[in-house]
A protein has these predicted regions:
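S-adenosylmethionine/decaboxylated-SAM
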Residues: 2-18, 28, 35-116
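N-terminal pre-P-loop "Q-motif" helix
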Residues: 22-26
Length: 116
């Protein structure tokens, strides 16, 4: 597992754009501002789980002790009753981004971090 983690991390740093780094820094700066404020974190739309896991890690690093409440349908966007433009957007979104994380995979990742 450790070797796999190193390989994944190395691939990320070798291939990530400055936009990806900026997003991580932006999320960190936001989390620092809220770390000491009372309350919990709500993630509305988990998608692939990246920002959720980023915030979970920031929570550990900054010892914020926040609770995370996450919502998602863990499935594809529905095409039922959508306009032509919405359907076009959804199809392009699927093609560009792929599928989101399924709930069982997310639960496994959270369990490794001892999060329910």
């Amino acid at each position: 597992m450790k070797k796999e983690m190193w390989e994944i991390e190395n691939k990320y740093f070798l291939n990530a754009t400055s936009q990806r780094f900026a997003k991580t820094i932006f999320h960190y700066e936001i989390f620092k501002k809220i770390a000491k404020i009372k309350g919990d974190i709500f993630e509305l739309g988990v998608f692939k789980g990246n920002s959720l896991m980023r915030f979970v890690n920031f929570n550990e690093v900054l010892k914020a002790k926040k609770k995370f409440i996450c919502f998602d349908d863990f499935g594809d966007f529905s095409m039922t009753g959508k306009s032509k433009d919405d359907k076009k957007f959804i199809l392009n979104w699927r093609k560009t981004t792929g599928k989101g994380i399924n709930i069982n995979s997310l639960k496994k990742k959270l369990k490794k971090k001892e999060i329910k």
